[in-house]
């Protein structure tokens, strides 16, 4: 059982937040000289032979305090049994009193005991309320002076205290040096206990966060097919509504990737689409996954388990397409056009021998039938699995366009979407009579990662986007997706390409 001395009632008090300015911190001994004869030994927390005392003054204000005068008041802590009591020589807390006036409101009422089951200790028990008030004051003082958090200074009820803590600078005033060292040793032990408990709390919180993240991941996998995340703002867009919104993000207006079939529906009048060469498929012309290469490049095969043919079959099943481009004839607001639309969802829209052949045949058909030509580009470049055959498509398509544009004087519109890179940018992507680009489209010859790894230089942000390149004169128009069809129609009419129902005798440019 340990006692702390508190001189509380000498005169009318004023409400204070801390100790009296005349008193030092809790580490120093400040005894009233007039009360030296009544000073009692206050046993240490650890050594019963040593003593330590401190005066706590001006904790709260009292207006009517005639009945509360006391010379010696002790705060008694029983740490083992977790008991907090007030020991007073005059036992004034056990005597009935009329009123206790606080600065804000009356705090205590008349004292009486009751056996009623609905008896409220806070309302009718003056000693309990007094203890509760003292506890709150000491709690505030300990937190400000001894740096003990509310999580470490707590009680199961307001009348019992369990104190675990340490002084800020690891010191506490005692009557001897030995007791001081003993106190510091005890403080270190308590600090260790606090750190261990905090580590346990951190581990519990981290485990809880891991469980929450795993649950979120499971939900994400479960509903992944219902939502599409924006590449720009990372907002979620409901897939069923995307098609009606032309694959434009609802949050930021960013133009998301669009399948070739959706683009055909966007540009071509309903019921006028006539596909060309839709059954032409790739046959692995250079045998990219031959046995000789497998023996020489075993490490690469471990990383890429699927062969080129397997990947072709996979994307054919996933997209419902035979290759990375769709070509055909249709009408745009009644104007007959030859159009080719690349699909980035099929092997990144890479250009292989089949893609090059289909585009070349489309250009030749438009040349022979005097049709305007539209090619929508969305590609990562030449297809590496076909080697030099894929690079050859650049020259083949460019030769067909030379005949179409220069010899026949026909009109070719190139539409660049995100991303358009590599061999497509270096060939037919930039050969249009009018080059249109979508907002924020990524257009480049070599990607940012390739440039930085090759030249060991940082590529500035935004230097390969449509707006920056448009300022440099690389494109003619930046057209949002919802205005694209009307802009194309006006361009064709400007070049004397009218709908069939208005003028049967079309004049070719």
Swiss-Prot record:
Localization, UniProt: Plastid, Chloroplast stroma
Query: Which pathway does this polypeptide act in?
Result: Lipid metabolism; malonyl-CoA biosynthesis; malonyl-CoA from acetyl-CoA: step 1/1
Q: What is its main location?
A: plastid
Basic and acidic residues: compositionally biased ranges? 170-182, 193-216
Transmembrane regions: none
What are the GO BP annotations of this UniProt entry? fatty acid biosynthetic process; malonyl-CoA biosynthetic process
The organism's place on the tree of life at top rank: Eukaryota
User: What InterPro entries does the record tag this protein with?
Assistant: AcCoA_carboxyl_beta, Acetyl_CoA_COase_Trfase_b_su, ClpP/crotonase-like_dom_sf, COA_CT_N
Positions that bind Zn(2+): 230, 233, 249, 252
What cofactor does this chain's UniProt record say it requires? Zn(2+)
| Region feature (Disordered) | 164-216, 288-307
**Chain ranges of zinc fingers (C4-type):** 230-252
Cofactor binding note from Swiss-Prot or TrEMBL: Binds 1 zinc ion per subunit.
> What EC numbers are recorded for this enzyme?
2.1.3.15
Reaction(s) this enzyme catalyzes, per UniProt:
N(6)-carboxybiotinyl-L-lysyl-[protein] + acetyl-CoA = N(6)-biotinyl-L-lysyl-[protein] + malonyl-CoA
Which keywords accompany this UniProt record? Answer: ATP-binding, Chloroplast, Fatty acid biosynthesis, Fatty acid metabolism, Lipid biosynthesis, Lipid metabolism, Metal-binding, Nucleotide-binding, Plastid, Transferase, Zinc, Zinc-finger
**Every CoA carboxyltransferase N-terminal domain range:** 226-509
How the protein assembles, per its UniProt entry? Answer: Acetyl-CoA carboxylase is a heterohexamer composed of biotin carboxyl carrier protein, biotin carboxylase and 2 subunits each of ACCase subunit alpha and ACCase plastid-coded subunit beta (accD).
Role according to the record = Component of the acetyl coenzyme A carboxylase (ACC) complex. Biotin carboxylase (BC) catalyzes the carboxylation of biotin on its carrier protein (BCCP) and then the CO(2) group is transferred by the transcarboxylase to acetyl-CoA to form malonyl-CoA.
Q: What is this protein called?
A: Acetyl-coenzyme A carboxylase carboxyl transferase subunit beta, chloroplastic
The organism's taxonomy opens as: Eukaryota, Viridiplantae, Streptophyta, Embryophyta, Tracheophyta
